[in-house]
């Protein structure tokens, strides 16, 4: 019997899916949790788009059922199991008796036992007004046999069986309550007819021991209780081929021979349970029906022991599943495949309708029950041609016409490997009832680059599975050669070797174990003695070329001049219209993308511009966004430089927005005063004795986590250069005049257009913490500044046609003189203690 722990594992099952199974469009950055940078990603259009909880989706999908049908949610089942948990042992004994009575064909005795258990459970409960109704709508056992979904295609009747205590969470999922197929129910049951109908469905005169009924057309007038319209259409349209489909279903239900009917019934119950769980979790009943029923057919083919591969033409390379499981990638299907998904909502169905973790456990359970896998994965894909009855009987493909349109079958790229059953050779005989206790079953993984296919993966004899590497690299090149030698007599040549032109989900080279579930890779090395490597956003499917071939500075040194190409190859997902796709969250370029203004590095320095022919510096900085509601009000955005011209008595300021060039009034508390130039002794005594000017090009600024270090400086340079190469043809770097003095560094930007107003940023020398050129390319120069008020740091990067070492020496000289004068003022060394 299933207990509360099993039902809880079923209800929380989808929340345990790996984070790699997600849609390819999804570029969410969950590796970093910088709270102060979340607003920038929202403004840039990136958005931290997390997938909603799978349990939440399940509850929504269960609530979208149009017609009332008796499918219970996992939460309701959990409550019902909790109510009648005390009678579990009594009902276990009754189910054993009922199973014996069912084999003898005594249907009346089973019905009596079921009603007895119903009375016992009803007496032990606290009386409530609706307790009798709820138990009338439920079956007489804890199997919930009144329900069913996709297993109506299987024609498997389910008897009771007792399950051992769960040993692992995989076994817990497999031992879910057995469901009753819907095909034998003409209409939704009424309370008065339920007991009589259950006697007929569980033990019929014309059924064999497994409950397979003789072929007879379904009732045309009764409405099907299934909420899946695709299954209803298939049942009505393919009722003419009942003999062939039901004959193959009977063969599927009994693996091997008639002496193994108990194992076949257990397989049928397992497939019924898992298939119904998948239907309850499907979010879109219309589009998921074809996929789910197609998955059921694939599972049945894998459970058939006598399935012999039909001679088929050599499949195309794109239709061939990969031989080695690599990881759980997130990626799109082949665009040139004929099985490409035609709807945008298909990726959403992969988490609910396909239930890949359920399928992996189902397949491993089928192997442990003694079935052998299919030899040719192509049998699950294309509808086979009409065959004679003898050939159809030997070919285990129930209801071959049930395969929907191939475009409806296509799904996202999912590759799944079972963790526990990786080792073990293929069974010697196709009808082996059960593997030895010390020999684990072979590993089957679901691989559907363009469709759902169950493909076997055999480990060589004598090898043990390494659980840590079963998802990343299940077998190396040497293991592949051993596999090919072992399977030469059993599998075709096209199944043993991957064609060179076929698309594989991972790299052809063995992948490292650290790449498991690594959908998005970021590398930021800040150690000064380590080779710096900053990798942009990429999928793990392209890990063979994910690192930049050349650093940004090396490439520009080779190409000479102010070339901004940071690497020889531009990422595929990068486009000039969306330059933020390659931005990591540690380094956000805020000057390159002018639309992102919150948390910008413009607030690190003092902004100045020409106002009425005179250069004026900002006096305030906007801390909130202000939307004007009257013509005389001034629009403000966060970090806008503001020149306050007048302060009103009613706490309103009249000022000039240096970013927009507009004047108006705004609330006084929407802007804070910024610390102006140093009014100390150093600044008031004399003007700077010297000023150095350099003509350079300004690339951008980026926020950095530390205030100094060559690693930080080089990482910021490479990040900005890599980002600028995407927009260099749209917005070339602005020419900039650097003025270096004892007061600080002043950036005067000037554009080519007449509408561009000349502006400048001033960084006080006391806020400059680090500067230098790139160690391998002196054309790049940058310096790190501290925010005047906050504990934040930003790096500003420049490039020039010539070496920028004179700029670095000038800044170093100014800093040294400023530091000496500051020490002389702050810590005077007078001979006050000498006599």
Swiss-Prot record:
Gene Ontology CC entries for this record: cytoplasm; neuronal cell body; postsynaptic density; protein-containing complex
Signal sequence region: none
Residue ranges of every copy of the PID domain listed in the record: 688-824
UniProt keywords, alphabetically: Cytoplasm, Phosphoprotein, SH3 domain
Source organism (scientific name): Rattus norvegicus
Positions of region (JNK-binding domain (JBD)): 111-278
Pfam families to which the protein is assigned, alphabetical: PID, SH3_9
Modified residues (Phosphoserine): 257, 304, 307
Protein role: The JNK-interacting protein (JIP) group of scaffold proteins selectively mediates JNK signaling by aggregating specific components of the MAPK cascade to form a functional JNK signaling module. JIP2 inhibits IL1 beta-induced apoptosis in insulin-secreting cells.
PROSITE patterns: PID, SH3
One MF term in the entry's GO annotations: kinesin binding
Biased composition (Low complexity): 117-131, 219-230, 272-307
The family this protein is said to belong to: Belongs to the JIP scaffold family.
Stretches assigned to the SH3 domain: 615-676
Database matches in SMART domains: PTB (SM00462), SH3 (SM00326)
Underlying gene: Mapk8ip2
This protein's name: C-Jun-amino-terminal kinase-interacting protein 2
Basic and acidic residues bias (residue ranges): 233-249
Region (Disordered): 1-26, 44-357, 369-509, 544-579
Record field: compositional bias (Polar residues): 142-173
